[in-house]
Swiss-Prot record:
Record organism: Vibrio cholerae serotype O1 (strain ATCC 39315 / El Tor Inaba N16961)
Keywords: Cell outer membrane, Lipoprotein, Membrane, Palmitate, Signal
Signal peptide region: 1-19
Subunit structure: Part of the Bam complex.
One GO CC annotation: Bam protein complex
Family the entry assigns: Belongs to the BamE family.
Gene name of the encoded protein: bamE
One annotated GO molecular function: protein-macromolecule adaptor activity
Protein name: Outer membrane protein assembly factor BamE
InterPro entries, sorted: BamE, BamE-like, BamE_dom
Membrane topology, as annotated: Lipid-anchor
Biological classification of the source: Bacteria, Pseudomonadati, Pseudomonadota, Gammaproteobacteria, Vibrionales
Compartment(s): Cell outer membrane
GO annotation, biological process: Gram-negative-bacterium-type cell outer membrane assembly; protein insertion into membrane
Lipid attachment residues per UniProt (S-diacylglycerol cysteine): 20
Length: 119
């Protein structure tokens, strides 16, 4: 009788203590993409002096434009693939008071031809 109690209690205790963490990898998780997908090829198309409409045409609408700083646009992309750690990429685009592109910062460097300007 004593053996039967241990035979039932031990597996239950091990399962409760592990919290099913061993089985977590067996459960399928979908890939989650959120925000504005931006790649280096798109950033390379940006030129110094582009208008806001031209930048919006190349990159799409920004994820965030702060109320107090309408000349700074934020493009944020967040990707979680299955059980892997999430990856976040940021691109910050700044305009001058006239609405012309003056700076690109973040995880993507400006292209080599950025300072050639718009023709």
């Amino acid at each position: 009788m004593q053996f039967t109690k241990w035979f039932i209690a031990l597996p239950l205790a091990v399962t409760a203590l592990s919290g099913c963490s061993l089985l977590e990898r067996l459960v399928y998780r979908i890939d989650i993409n959120q925000g504005n997908y931006v790649d280096q090829q798109s950033v390379d198309q940006l030129k110094f002096g582009m208008s806001k409409d031209q930048v919006r045409f190349v990159l799409g609408s920004p994820m965030l434009v702060e109320n107090g700083y309408p000349d700074t646009w934020y493009y944020i992309y967040h990707h979680t693939q299955g059980h892997n750690d999430p990856v976040q990429k940021n691109l910050i685009v700044k305009f001058n008071d006239g609405g012309k592109l003056v700076n690109v910062a973040g995880d993507f460097p400006a292209g080599d031809s950025f300072f050639e300007g718009v023709n």
